[in-house]
């Protein structure tokens, strides 16, 4: 199974790139973590945010390979603790589909992305900066994998 993070935004700060790479490189070959960056729409004083979200959503959904499970990150989504995420990872593996996790930009996800989702996951009730979410996602997914593989990374 491949896990794909589809995230709005390019040109992230160096610490974001390094943090993401640190965890993504640890994934086993049979479960690679791939990042697909979607160019963010231009935001300014008179920007049409609805139109920007629509365009970003179209680009995100176009990046999802046919047949992939779509999981959106959204505050009202289901909350999983680490063990529940590990269980979810196992369920995804049994489903025999690759997984695309959609991470929105500053205003969140387009309605079309939410409508296309097979699942919606709330990473936190807090509003997190979208660059930070990439690092948190990579670490959380790696930790969940480590539990399923009985790897010593996760300690209770």
Curated annotation (Swiss-Prot):
Pfam families: SPOUT_MTase. The keyword Phosphoprotein does not apply. The keyword Ribonucleoprotein does not apply. It is an enzyme of class 2 (transferase). Keywords: Cytoplasm, Methyltransferase, rRNA processing, S-adenosyl-L-methionine, Transferase. InterPro entries: Alpha/beta_knot_MTases (IPR029028), RlmH-like (IPR003742), tRNA_m1G_MTases_N (IPR029026). HAMAP family: 23SrRNA_methyltr_H. This is Ribosomal RNA large subunit methyltransferase H. The gene is rlmH.
